[in-house]
Amino acid sequence: NTVRDVYTKTVKNGPYQVQIPSDGILRAYKRIQITSRVQGILKTIKPLFKSGQEYKLGQNIALIESSEYRANVIAQRASLYNLITSVLPDLELDFPQAYENWSLYLKKFNLEKPVPALPKMEDKVRLFVSGRGIISSYYSLQNLEKILTFYRIRAPFSGVLVQANVSEGSL
């Protein structure tokens, strides 16, 4: 009983696909319903918003026309910018230590980008700018900017669109 020949195969490590045949109803592990928090016309993007379309985590699923709302947000940014500009001379006279911070704040202010965080300020300066409506305008603007993000719907995880109840160009 001596073994004369032993046959071997060289194994190459890597991913192998295993198939397990089965019958029955297949249910998705994660199935969610995505709805829009804003109204508007659905824009055409690639890939098309159709049933069976695969999406990766963070990929745009749908874009809703936002040009009118975006223009409103930019107008509110300009309004905040004007409010701050109007109080700069008073800040320079009454609170010279705070003037530098607010001046730098205005230099990094860009109407096309989200509003930067307000500079650090003492209680007296906070009361002064609050009395001029700057703080309330700032937080209103932050709310508008948050709503602006709802015009872009992104995939919360990688998966497949099972059902689409709207099509491009519709409300």
Where does each model-flagged region fall?
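Active-site-adjacent helical/loop segments in soluble small-molecule enzymes
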Residues: 24
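Conserved phosphate/oxyanion-binding catalytic-loop motifs
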Residues: 36
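Periplasmic scaffold and linker elements that assemble and bridge Gram-negative envelope complexes
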Residues: 4-14, 27, 39, 43-44, ...
